[in-house]
Amino acid sequence: MNPYEQRRRRVLDQLQFGEMMVLYSGESVASSMDEGFEFEANHHFFYLTGLRRENMALVLANTHHPAHVILFIEEPIPDMERWTGRRVTIDEAKAVSGIDDVRYIDSVESLISRCVARETVEAAYFDCYRNAMGDTDSYNMQKAKRFAQQYPTIALKNAHTMLSAMRMVKDEDEIKTLERAIAITDQGLRRVLATLEPGRMEYQQQAEFEYEIRMRGAERVSFPTIAG
């Protein structure tokens, strides 16, 4: 059993019969007519699926025996992929997430509607995290509000509380990932020290660090580097 499946089982163990959880990875935000800001997937979605692409959704529904575990992804469009890059295929999504039931994202709303209509749904969990009162609603918050309007008799619960508590205690896979990240960071800092000399600029040392960690397999830095 892969770590994402183990985490989903822990979530399902906490859902009462008649409860469901819906998580969205989010959507990219356009920065211009032909470009978008760098996409950051919802962390809870990634925690339960291992996937970081936009326009995906996960439905966990303890409304049936056995419980529903369904992943929704974007349908590949070859002409678009020339400009946006390859999309995850159904087989790839199954392999990464360990979820057997993978469908295309345009069917997620109808699935939720059928689940509500045909099964006993008393409460629905969405990621309703808000850092401050003035914050713009996240994509998941927007979906939660829309769900509440469409199904006012179903209680809305915050998945953020449950999932944040789970993520505070690292499992074996997370510990191994952290140890690898620490080792890569160490090598990056050693390169910074080895190349440091009078006259070098901060942005040059930033480039040395990021080159080293990327050459060792890091996808990116965890936080933006503060360098002048």
Regions found by a protein language model. Name each.
Residues M1-Q187:
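A composition/biophysics-driven feature that prefers long, compositionally simple stretches
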